[in-house]
């Protein structure tokens, strides 16, 4: 069910990150180099999850694997135990909670009209539902952390923290971000562009679906531009 996917991606997936933050507080303050293998593992896991996204044919699976890749960045940022790293990790968890939830919502909107989640069968929506295409574009832009959303703020904090700690991590981080942009573009083009496969009359988008997307997008922009609202 779509509600379960949205709650799982937005809230339950973040409990692991919260648990790691709590555990790091009670661990002894060891020399940070001890954690290098774990940081490399987290970033490598993010890259592998991103590569898995690129070869997915199922829309819901693609969004689920994108959640895994973002949590790899969160884990790497938490492990280095710096104020910027922790701030970036918490901001990315909030940002990705809204973004992945919105993506699952859009995937369900597509599924209700096509009755399939296979990417090659869901193309051509920009001709039929132009407003839904606008939401797809906005949410995909947020997924690749474009300003002025909190996604951009959080990834900037994480990149700064990791670069200050070990400049070499930029190679893995940069590769991860490049693949993220690639699969986001692939997801958008696969669902929106090209000739439509739908033969019957398609139901138009409803006001409740537009409202749901607005309620996902407004917090992402507001928290970034006025963080004192939540801090």
Swiss-Prot record:
Location, primary (coarse class): mitochondrion
Gene Ontology cellular component terms for the protein in this record: mitochondrial membrane
GO BP terms: ATP synthesis coupled electron transport; electron transport coupled proton transport
Described function: Core subunit of the mitochondrial membrane respiratory chain NADH dehydrogenase (Complex I) that is believed to belong to the minimal assembly required for catalysis. Complex I functions in the transfer of electrons from NADH to the respiratory chain. The immediate electron acceptor for the enzyme is believed to be ubiquinone.
Keyword ATP-binding: no
Signal sequence, renumbered to the chain: none
Reactions the enzyme catalyzes: a ubiquinone + NADH + 5 H(+)(in) = a ubiquinol + NAD(+) + 4 H(+)(out)
Keyword Transmembrane helix: yes
GO molecular function, one term: ubiquinone binding
The name this protein goes by in its record: NADH-ubiquinone oxidoreductase chain 4
Organism: Tropidolaemus wagleri (Wagler's pit viper)
UniProt EC number: 7.1.1.2
Keywords, comma-separated and alphabetical: Electron transport, Membrane, Mitochondrion, NAD, Respiratory chain, Translocase, Transmembrane, Transmembrane helix, Transport, Ubiquinone
PANTHER family, per database record: NADH-UBIQUINONE OXIDOREDUCTASE CHAIN 4
Family according to the record: Belongs to the complex I subunit 4 family.
Cellular compartments annotated: Mitochondrion membrane
Membrane topology: Multi-pass membrane protein
Residues annotated as transmembrane: 1-21, 34-54, 61-80, 84-106, 128-148, 156-176, 211-231
């Amino acid at each position: 069910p779509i509600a379960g996917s949205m709650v799982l991606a937005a809230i339950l997936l973040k409990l692991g990150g919260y648990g790691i933050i709590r555990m790091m507080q009670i661990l002894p303050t060891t020399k940070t180099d001890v954690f290098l293998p774990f940081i490399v593992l987290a970033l490598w896991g993010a890259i592998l999850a991103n590569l898995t996204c690129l070869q997915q044919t199922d829309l819901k699976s693609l969004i689920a694997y994108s959640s895994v890749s973002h949590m790899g960045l969160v884990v790497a940022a938490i492990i280095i135990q710096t104020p910027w790293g922790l701030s970036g990790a918490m901001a990315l968890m909030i940002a990705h909670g809204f973004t992945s939830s919105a993506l699952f919502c859009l995937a369900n909107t597509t599924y209700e009209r096509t009755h399939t989640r296979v990417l090659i069968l869901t193309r051509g929506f920009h001709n039929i539902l132009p407003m839904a295409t606008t939401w797809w574009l906005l949410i995909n832009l947020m997924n690749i952390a474009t300003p002025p959303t909190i996604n951009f703020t959080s990834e900037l904090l994480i990149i700064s923290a990791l670069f200050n700690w070990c400049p070499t991590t930029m190679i893995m981080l940069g590769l991860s971000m490049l693949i993220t942009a690639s699969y986001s573009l692939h997801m958008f083009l696969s669902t929106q562009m090209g000739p439509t496969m739908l033969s019957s009359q398609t139901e138009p988008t409803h006001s409740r679906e537009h409202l749901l997307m607005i309620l996902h997008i407004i917090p992402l922009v507001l928290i970034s531009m006025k963080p004192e609202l939540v801090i």
